[in-house]
């Protein structure tokens, strides 16, 4: 890990008004982390009490490793001869951690786009990144697919939105490497749990709000409120231009609009008075590749657009990303011209194995609305063809959506129900939640996902469409006891299909 510049510790903690200090504060610190394994001499350790791990259990360990400062919400009789422990209110610790992390990273200012919504976060943040790269700008992204810089392979971070210290450290890393842009996914969990505190956001995007995470939020109104917290991060400082980009087609649009104190730019595929409106949407196939065209009405006039994605919802995602990049000062015409150059989004309506006699589509759909849009978007591809669909329910997730998912995916001719990182939950219960909603008997259950992918490919015949849903490009499964094993839907499916159809 690259060291950050040391700075005076008194400058770091001067704004923390309610605290108790044990030991002597150091005059300088180096890095900051919530992960005890990353602490070395002169570092700051933030002891967060999480759902499964309590950082306070590692305070003695980090002191032995040479930590200069520990931020905690409770104190025991630690040996603080060479370390200071600052105790603060438990519900304030993420805020204070963000202040420290931001200051240690020298303000870590990069142009930042944050995307929130039930569906579309990964697609939009990736599109923003890809558009900026196509325009020759340095860029990065953080989200479900990990942390990626420019054209490098992403590094897996664990959560869609990492903890607040990691997020600030990554932004600081970008600043030091002179990478000018960041697009990141802001999950509702992240906002409630304080993972984006003190991040300077320039553009905040809202995609949509549909049934999901009820085990965490409780009801849709609370879910909407928690999503709207993103716009509070823009603050009331108007010395720098900040914007909210909102999907006018979503039923929660008006709530988000009211929570936005900065300028709003909205988009739609239904409302012609939206700031950016896409209509005349058409999907077609060219040399085995599926494309979408549409007419764009914008503040700079109307333009004919072409993308390499399918589905009206992907047009909405393109509009959101398009606006975020347009707000940097590019002309609409210039951005329209680069759209055909943008390649497939890994695991998002991704069509695999073009040399195979079957169509294989990989998608991350994992909510009722996501499945509905997935099936709508692929309807033209599936026309007069047999559709086989694989889906899985994850462990440690909201399973109340299972029956509705089962009902929606019953549109497919045949379904293979499996799991998606079952963790410590009963696989029969997980699969059973989806099974409850099935409206026909043309399905089977195969709990281990690798076997399930192989099974659905074995069932496929030339001309069929195989949809692999709920996982996208994730390359692992988490099993009982937290055991992590390799698995990739696309890799397993293509290998199995090539064997079955004797394709080299």
Q: Which stretches of residues belong to each language-model region?
A:
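ATP-dependent carboxylate-amine ligase
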Residues: 1-20, 41-44, 320-347, 351-504
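Short acidic/polar active-site loop segments enriched in Thr and Asp
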Residues: 68-69, 180, 202, 413
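Phosphate-binding loop of NTP-binding sites
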Residues: 13-14, 94-248, 252-262, 319, ...
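N-terminal leader/targeting and accessory segments in enzymes
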Residues: 1-103, 251, 279, 306, ...
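Short glycine-rich anion-binding loops that position phosphate/pyrophosphate groups of nucleotides
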Residues: 50-51, 76, 188-189, 211-212, ...
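A short, gly/pro- and small-residue-rich
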Residues: 55-67, 86-91, 202-208, 223-228, ...
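Acidic, Mg2+-coordinating active-site environments of NTP-dependent enzymes
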Residues: 76-81, 203-360, 435-440
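Glycine/threonine-rich flexible loop motifs
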Residues: 52, 56-58, 193, 215-222, ...
